[in-house]
């Protein structure tokens, strides 16, 4: 079974295909809460994975995610690290540059903003201009940048600081 983050890029997936991960995370929360031997609670907050390029079609998906998580869904993560140089790879997830500039992506992000959900993603330092565009377009959206904007030190950046 692939993770929700890789399912996003599966051509056979649809906008609802990653909801089982949110459901599973919430079930783990309930299990930990009901386990008297366990002294800690897990998954009090859940960050799921969705492809924001579905745009306006994500409204019922987000609503369902909030429902099945009993409000524990706090944000969405999308792996967007991409570079045009084939020597630079982000691992199992193959994506392309420019996704954050796509009008459908922006529409999907607006749904997050409306529902007070954060947008959490990993990009390379070469994509920070896309992040800036999104931040200026959606000033009330909470954006979480992972891995400090992914400084690249291979390919054309090898040996550069």
Regions found by a protein language model. Give the residues of each.
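Glycine-rich phosphate-binding "P-loop"
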Residues: 9-13, 78-99
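Acidic-and-aromatic substrate-binding clefts and catalytic sites of carbohydrate-active enzymes
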Residues: 14-18, 50-58, 122-129, 153
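Catalytic pocket-lining loop regions of alpha/beta-barrel enzymes
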Residues: 95-161
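Acidic (Asp/Glu)-rich catalytic clusters
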Residues: 24-41, 60-76, 102-103, 107-114, ...
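The substrate-binding groove and active-site-proximal loops of carbohydrate-active enzymes
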Residues: 8-16, 44-52, 95-97, 118
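Hydrophobic faces of well-ordered beta-strands that scaffold small-molecule active sites
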Residues: 1-2, 44-48, 74-78, 119-121, ...
């Amino acid at each position: 079974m692939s993770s929700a983050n890789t399912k996003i890029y599966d051509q056979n997936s649809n906008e609802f295909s990653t909801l089982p991960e949110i459901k599973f995370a919430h079930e783990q929360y309930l299990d930990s809460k009901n386990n008297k031997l366990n002294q800690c609670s897990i998954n009090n907050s859940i960050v799921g994975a969705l492809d924001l390029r579905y745009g306006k079609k994500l409204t019922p998906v987000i609503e369902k995610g909030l429902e099945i998580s009993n409000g524990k869904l706090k944000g969405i993560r999308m792996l967007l690290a991409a570079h045009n140089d084939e020597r630079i790879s982000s691992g199992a997830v193959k994506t392309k540059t420019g996704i954050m500039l796509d009008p459908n992506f922006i529409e999907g992000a607006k749904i997050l903003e409306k529902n007070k959900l954060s947008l959490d993603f990993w990009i390379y330092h070469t994509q920070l201009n896309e992040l800036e565009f999104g931040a200026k377009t959606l000033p009330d959206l909470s954006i979480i940048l992972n891995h400090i904007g992914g400084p690249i030190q291979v390919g054309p950046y090898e040996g550069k600081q």
